[in-house]
Amino acid sequence: MLKIDSLRIRYGNVEAVKGISLEVQHREIVALLGANGAGKSSTLRGVMNLSPKFGGKVFLRGEDISRLDTSEIVRKGCCLVPEGRKIFPYFTVEENLMMGDYGNSKGKTRQTKANLERVFSLFPILAERKRQLGGTLSGGEQQMLAIGRSLMLEPDIIMMDEPSLGLAPILVEQIFALIQEIRDKLNRTILLVEQNAHMALQIADRGYILETGRIVLSGTARELRENPDVAKAYLGMA
């Protein structure tokens, strides 16, 4: 589905991503883990052509998308749920969701309505609050809104950047359960950047560990959970 080959990203003289390669297969949940500053968010932004790549390539279903505009990448089926949610606070919930459909081809009103109903089915709380301003929602509800917005164009792969950031523990569990549901019921593929390694590895099929811009370890979620170095560094186990 998604293949990153020797990706390099630089901000000025600082090389944030140093030639990483990874793959995400159809209907997989793949976790990209690491400390702050490891290059996780830069990797996702690089896929979307939002960060300055100076080396490597990105392939979506075998097609080289490295030089495409962000809008073209989205239309080809790859979406990003950004860190911090980035909703429109003065738009209603429904208007925020419709922004996810912005740029869709004319004449797809029926499909747009179906997509909206699908999102409301997945997130009933958003249906209840569809006339409410996005900025008045709780943190968990805003995260649901950001994820729902990404679903409006029916992407094949969704990249999520720190979806549990700043949420209460009970909401974290809800968000991760919803991520699983999106994969299982909607057949979506997910690349998940997350500092909550424990929860991420509970739902992921595979994972990669990123340190200072390089992948230092990869394996199945079970292999990473049982790795003593990973347990000590990321799972809080001595």
What feature does the model see in each segment?
Residues 1-238:
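Glycine-rich phosphate-binding loops of nucleotide-dependent enzymes
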